[in-house]
Amino acid sequence: LSLGMPNLAFIETATRLLESTGYRVTYIPQQDVTVEFYRRLPARGDDLILLRVHSSGRLVTKSGTVVDDSSISLCTGEPLSKAYPKERNSGQLGGFETLGTEQLFFSVRGEFFARSASGKFPQSVIVIMGCEGLRIPRTAEIFLDLGAQAVIGWNDQSSTHVMDAPAAPFLEAWLRQPQTWKEAVATARRSVES
């Protein structure tokens, strides 16, 4: 979401919360979130992954019709090009246009992780902070098959404020209180509903 919708305050708050509970935080700026970054994501060994990236469970057909996709696409910061012909031709990669930009960027679909990613998630908790992160469960299922403990996200499109608002209460509840990730999700939900 840094692409067109940055939120430095969220990054600072999340970093402070995580570091205060012993986590070592690695922030990856959007321009470094590439196809290769996603390919190596399971093998990085991260306990907690906050994917604050554009995402969608829909695609546009050649005729211009918007239809449900078979999985969620996660946007990269890598401009669309002729690179990765094998992955493009097999439908593992697509193009993604974000609001406020006229440039297309690569997006990775669920099957990319199933067929082209390296390594396994070490019981990671993955939070997909973009739109529709759980609208179609296939990508989350693939993450679980690759060793993730849990995948948390939204079912629909939303504004960045609504997507960012529950993240800090979730981290606070999960890391400091401490609650299970399921309890922390409920706490975060209550915090934004009140």
Residue map of PLM features:
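Extracytoplasmic/periplasmic, Sec-exported soluble proteins
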Residues: 3-10, 41, 101-111, 118, ...
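A domain-level signal for caspase-like cysteine endopeptidase catalytic cores
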Residues: 1-95
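Cysteine protease catalytic core and zymogen-processing segment of caspase-like enzymes
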Residues: 58-151
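Extended aliphatic helical segments
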Residues: 25, 33-35, 53, 60, ...
